[in-house]
Amino acid sequence: VTACTSASSAGTVTVVDRPDTHAVNANYMGYRAPLRPLNFIKLPVGSIRPEGWVRKFLELQRDGLTGHLGEISAWLEKDDNAWLTTGGDHGWEEVPYWLKGYSSLAYILNDPEMIEETKYWIEGVFASCQPDGYFGPVNERNGKRELWAQMIMLWCLQSYYEYSQDRRVIDLMTNYFKWQMTVPDDRLLEDFWENSRGGDNIISIYWLYSHTGDAFLLELAEKIHRNTADWTQSTSLPNWHNVNIAQCFREPATYYMQTGDSAMLKASYNVHRLIRRTFGQVPGGMFGADENARLGYIDPRQGVETCGLVEQMASDEIMLRMTGDP
């Protein structure tokens, strides 16, 4: 990273290995103490207006499948949708996955029709709130509430808050996290996907804590961490699913932002190296995993899922924000 100094020393360039985090950014919100400071702060969605070829490519995305998926996808059918109707039978996972990108595209392009469509779904989320703090579809497996879809929707709500400053987001997240505090450990994050991906829940907890300073949130983050799959193993992984690995290797580093325990940070780097040491043969920097990484299938003919690629990109960006490491 290079940084130009003040006008009094114009022409001088200082090279640093990572940004200085001692000063507090007065313009944009980072992590609230005692969380470790972020090295890079994500700008609120919509604060940068694209021009030129970047805008053109975003418009192509709007005019293509992303912008029109609701017209053709059964999962986004509004009648009896799980995010719009109590007991709805479809869309519990697919809606927030799509909305996460669709809504950000709407805000960045400031597209009125897309913003209105986004608002329709967001209002459905608010309408789903229950008195105990839970929100969204009720999806139970073996009598235990499954929370993976909520983890995705929480990210949609954060983007909506950045765009709108709608206080209902803060209230919903606060009430939902209070509900999570009431769930016994033996009934929390027991399903495969949510158990692997608890780190996404922690990121949302830290986002809310940085806005409100509610102390119980740090206690909840510890609870989520201890009930999430163990991504700190030195020579193995909790599972070998490509999306889980790309998405979840950052969980220990995320928790490091609270504990300051360097072993947590090293664990994330270890997973990154471990999977690539054996399976890192896919052009472009990914590891080979046709759904799962499999011993014996380690050559460049192996593929990887598109969703594994995008989760790796997201993880790399989040890791950069947290660590400052290039």
Describe the role of every protein-language-model region.
Residues 10-326:
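Glycan-recognition and catalytic cores of secretory/periplasmic carbohydrate-active enzymes
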